Amino acid sequence: LKCHNKLVPFLSKTCPEGKNLCYKMTMLKMPKIPIKRGCTDACPKSSLLVKVVCCNKDKCN
């Protein structure tokens, strides 16, 4: 699985063993601007300020 791991969308990395989800965190007030991206084993929870989107396809975040 390859996930974007920087704020700029064209940089990606191959996820290590066991981390088979990509995630993207955005501020709820500014949903177009990602604040964090990467690989994860379990989808982080969204909060009052941050929305988290997870997916399992290459570069889907």
Curated annotation (Swiss-Prot):
Its main location: secreted. The lineage of its organism: Eukaryota, Metazoa, Chordata, Craniata, Vertebrata. Disulfide bonds join C3-C22, C15-C39, C43-C54, C55-C60. GO terms for cellular component: extracellular region. It is found in: Secreted. Pfam families: Toxin_cobra-type. Expressed by the venom gland. Belongs to the three-finger toxin family. Short-chain subfamily. Type IB cytotoxin sub-subfamily. CDD domains: TFP_snake_toxin (cd00206). Is classified as a P-type cytotoxin, since a proline residue stands at position 31 (Pro-31 in standard classification). GO terms for biological process: killing of cells of another organism; regulation of blood pressure. This protein lyses red blood cells and has cardiotoxic and hypotensive activities. GO terms for molecular function: toxin activity. Keywords: Cardiotoxin, Cytolysis, Disulfide bond, Hemolysis, Hypotensive agent, Secreted, Toxin. The keyword Disulfide bond applies. This is Cytotoxin 1. The keyword Secreted applies.
